[in-house]
Design a protein with these regions (language model features):
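Loop/turn elements at helix/coil->beta-strand transitions in domains of secreted/extracellular proteins
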Residues: 13-18, 46-53, 83-87, 123-125, ...
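Extracytoplasmic/secreted envelope proteins and their assembly/folding machinery
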Residues: 9, 30-40, 157-164
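Short, internal strand/loop/helix patches
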Residues: 70-124
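Thiol-/selenol-based redox modules, centered on thioredoxin-like
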Residues: 122-170
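Aromatic-flanked redox-active Cys/Sec active sites in thiol-based oxidoreductases
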Residues: 16, 20-26, 58
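Extracytoplasmic/secreted cell-surface and envelope-processing proteins
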Residues: 27-30, 61-65, 97-101, 106-117, ...
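A short beta-strand-turn-helix
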Residues: 1-17, 42
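Structural microenvironment flanking redox-active thiols in thiol-disulfide oxidoreductases
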Residues: 28-83, 95-99
């Protein structure tokens, strides 16, 4: 649905939005993005359609294969056993396009960090949540807060889900 589109926070204006920052070539990042995808599907199944999510690959990982992150037909990884993911997976660039006007000084072109990862001071596996007005609410690192239901008996997953619902209801 979003293939080839330039998407980001302004694309989801008026809705709670989550951004997962990962490395498309690492199995742990792929597994976490799969859980974020499952959470999104669960929310939609429960009638919650105004919480949007997407993933963003770091510029430094631009040459990694995307196949198993989005679970297309070329992927044979066990992280894709439930089929293709529906969440958009975007690529951060290091071209400085986002480093002007209000963002001047927050990032630089060609510094090998990527514009969005640089501006938002991203750490691998961060999940950044914005409210309906595009304001920063919180950041949860999914390395340390593993949302897998096999970890912490699903408590972290449920905590993240309830947080999204509470932000949505504000």
């Amino acid at each position: 649905k979003y293939y080839g589109d330039n998407i980001g926070p302004s694309f989801f204006s008026g809705q709670v939005s989550c951004y997962y920052f990962g490395k498309q070539g690492w199995s742990t990042c792929r597994a976490r993005f799969g859980i974020v995808n499952d959470l999104y599907n669960e929310l939609v199944t429960e009638g919650i359609t105004d919480v949007k999510m997407m993933g963003v690959n770091g510029y430094q990982y631009i040459n990694d294969s995307i196949d198993c992150m989005i679970c297309n037909d070329e992927c044979t990884s066990s992280t894709c056993s439930s089929g293709p993911r529906i969440l958009p997976w975007a690529q951060d660039y290091d071209d400085g396009v986002n480093c002007t006007d209000d963002n001047s000084g927050l990032c630089e072109a060609d510094d090998t960090l990527g514009d969005i990862w640089d501006m938002w001071d991203i750490t691998l596996r961060d999940l950044v949540i914005l409210d309906r007005d595009g304001r920063y609410v919180t950041r949860i690192n999914l390395t340390y807060t593993n949302p897998d239901s096999n970890s912490t008996c699903g408590q972290n997953y449920e905590t993240i889900k309830q947080l999204l619902i509470s932000i949505r209801n504000q």
